[in-house]
From Swiss-Prot:
GO terms for biological process: L-tryptophan biosynthetic process. Signal peptide: none annotated. This is N-(5'-phosphoribosyl)anthranilate isomerase. GO terms for molecular function: phosphoribosylanthranilate isomerase activity. InterPro entries: Aldolase_TIM, PRAI_dom, RibuloseP-bd_barrel, TrpF_fam. It comes from Dehalococcoides mccartyi (strain ATCC BAA-2266 / KCTC 15142 / 195) (Dehalococcoides ethenogenes (strain 195)). Its EC number is 5.3.1.24. Belongs to the TrpF family. Pfam families: PRAI. It is an enzyme of class 5 (isomerase). Transmembrane segments: none annotated. It catalyses: N-(5-phospho-beta-D-ribosyl)anthranilate = 1-(2-carboxyphenylamino)-1-deoxy-D-ribulose 5-phosphate. Keywords: Amino-acid biosynthesis, Aromatic amino acid biosynthesis, Isomerase, Tryptophan biosynthesis. The gene is trpF. CDD domains: PRAI (cd00405).
Length: 219
C-alpha cells in the first residue's frame, strides 16, 4: 500500500480529519513557513492523536535548524519522526535522535541517475535507513510550493529505491501520478488546501483517490 502524508497541519481538527482518512503520517511544520506552528500547538495535536488506534505518525518538519533544536522540539512535542527539508548533511542526519525523512530537492535539469547517486550516498553514510522524500527545488521555499517536477524521474528512481514524493500533487492529478510513477509514498500540503487553509473534504478525497489508484494498479 502507498504511504500517505498530509503535511502542514495547523489545527487539531485538521489532524483528526487526517487520522480518520487512514493517512500514515501527519506533518507539522517548525521551519520558516506560512504553515509554521508553535510547540504548544504541536503538542496539542500530539495529545489529540495519541489515544487513536490506529493513528498517523506525527512528523515534525525542519529546515537548516541545529540538531540540538530539532531533538529538543521532537522530545517536547512527542514527535514520531523528523523530516529534514533543508540542506542538512548526512553527518547532520546522524545527530537526530528520531527516524528521519530526508528531503532530496529535485531541481530543473536533475536526472534520475543523480537522485539515485544521492540516495546511495545517504545509505552509505547514515547509521539508520531514512525515508527519502523527493520534492521540487524552489529558491524561496523548502516545500509546500505546489510545484511539480518530472514524474519520469520518480518512475526511474522507484525501480531501484522506495521513495516518497511531494510537489504539485492534488486530488485531480494524484491517480495519474501513481499510474506513472509508482512511488512508495506521497506527501501533500497545498494540494489539499482552499485559500491556504487545510480543507478536510479535499484531504478525504485525496486519500480516497490514492487508495483507489493503489488498489487498481498492477505492480
Amino acid at each position: 500500500m502507498i504511504k500517505t502524508k498530509i503535511c502542514g497541519l495547523t489545527e487539531v481538527g485538521q489532524a483528526l480529519a487526517t487520522a480518520r482518512t487512514g493517512a500514515d503520517f501527519a506533518g507539522v511544520v517548525f521551519a520558516e513557513s506560512k504553515r509554521r506552528i508553535t510547540t504548544e500547538k504541536a503538542l496539542e495535536i500530539a495529545e489529540a492523536l495519541k489515544p487513536l488506534n490506529p493513528r498517523p505518525m506525527l512528523v515534525g518538519v525542519f529546515a537548516n535548524q541545529t540538531a540540538e533544536e530539532v531533538n529538543r522540539i521532537a522530545s517536547v512535542c512527542r514527535l514520531d519522526r523528523v523530516q529534514l527539508s533543508g540542506n542538512e548533511s548526512w553527518e547532520y542526519c546522524n545527530q537526530v535522535n528520531l527516524p528521519v525523512i530526508k528531503v532530496i530537492h529535485v531541481a530543473e535539469g536533475t536526472t534520475a541517475e543523480l537522485v539515485i547517486q544521492e540516495i546511495q550516498a545517504g545509505l552509505k553514510a547514515l547509521k539508520k535507513t531514512p525515508v527519502f522524500l523527493l520534492d521540487t527545488h524552489t529558491k524561496a521555499l523548502f516545500g509546500g510550493s505546489g510545484q511539480s517536477f518530472d514524474w519520469q524521474i520518480v518512475k526511474q528512481v522507484s525501480l531501484k529505491y522506495p521513495v516518497m514524493v511531494a510537489g504539485g500533487l492534488n486530488p485531480e492529478n494524484i491517480q495519474g501520478f501513481i499510474k506513472i510513477a509508482k512511488p512508495w509514498g506521497i506527501d501533500v500540503a497545498s494540494g489539499v488546501e482552499t485559500d491556504g487553509i487545510k480543507d478536510t473534504a479535499k484531504i478525504h478525497l485525496f486519500i480516497e483517490r490514492v487508495k483507489d489508484a493503489d488498489g487498481n494498479r498492477i505492480c
